[in-house]
Amino acid sequence: MRKIVNQAEKNFTVVKYDIKNEEMIEYLTRMATLSNNLTNTVIYHQRQWYFYTQNVYYTEHPNEHFKPYQYNAELIDELKECMYEYNQRKAEQNKKQTDFIAFGLDAHFLHEYYKKTGQPDYTNDELSAQVAQQVTRKVSQTFKAFRKALTDYFKNPEKYEACPQLPRYNKKRRSL
């Protein structure tokens, strides 16, 4: 998803560290692996919800070129049940309820959902809660940016070289 816009060049300084302590290498590799696994878990949930909402949209707005997406119906039912409870709690607190169909899954909802379901990648004892929340927040921001870019693409396709692509899973890394 690239915009054709002139941007100022950005300069980066790259610092390479040669870590000789085997315990530190193992620790950093383990943290990177856990973080990567959580990232892929959040991406999976976000993608499944996106597929579901696209099917709902095109059921209401038929299009001859649309091919329905496959999605995990059990996961969607579980998410919808948790969303209902989430919005009920917000209503009790006199807060605005979240429209998940229009806005997708936000990081705060996913945080509550993962804690409630005991998602192993999120509640892992080795990965701190702060890191887990940050990973969830970053992936949610990526999907929010994707939806915004996709909407803008359909309004102004000339600004883009190609249609924005759905965020993909991270590859598993073997070592640092």
Task: Mark where each language-model region is.
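Nucleic-acid substrate recognition interfaces
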Residues: 1-176
